[in-house]
Amino acid sequence: MQPNIVLINCDDLGYGDLGCYGSEKNDTPCLDALAAGGRRFTDFYMASAICSPSRGAMMTGCYPPRIGFGSFHGEIVLFPGDCMGLHPDEVTMADVLKNAGYRTMHIGKWHCGDQKEFLPTSHGFDDYYGLPYSND
């Protein structure tokens, strides 16, 4: 039986903000329990400090400029109605997992394009429940 995979991406979360990573300030028992029963990344860094490039990079394993989300000095954040997004031909972790027999779902903020061809269901996710973007 294949293991379940749950990948949590949280904007503006510091390395020591959860109890499972040593926080004595924040009480996070549910996330701590989830971490205790699985794998944790202890050296995981995003490719960008802003939404669209970091999410696109995490989904594809590519640097933001490679997937069209700007240069290292002029990264692009997508906004509602933009006619660009993560190109449908890019291979995502959802594509790879689906090919390995997994059922995939994206929950939460996507921020890689809000047009139909850029949404999670066009990138290997079987289901999607969330926001295509936010303006924060």
Spans of model-derived segments:
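Formylglycine-dependent sulfatase
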Residues: 1-136
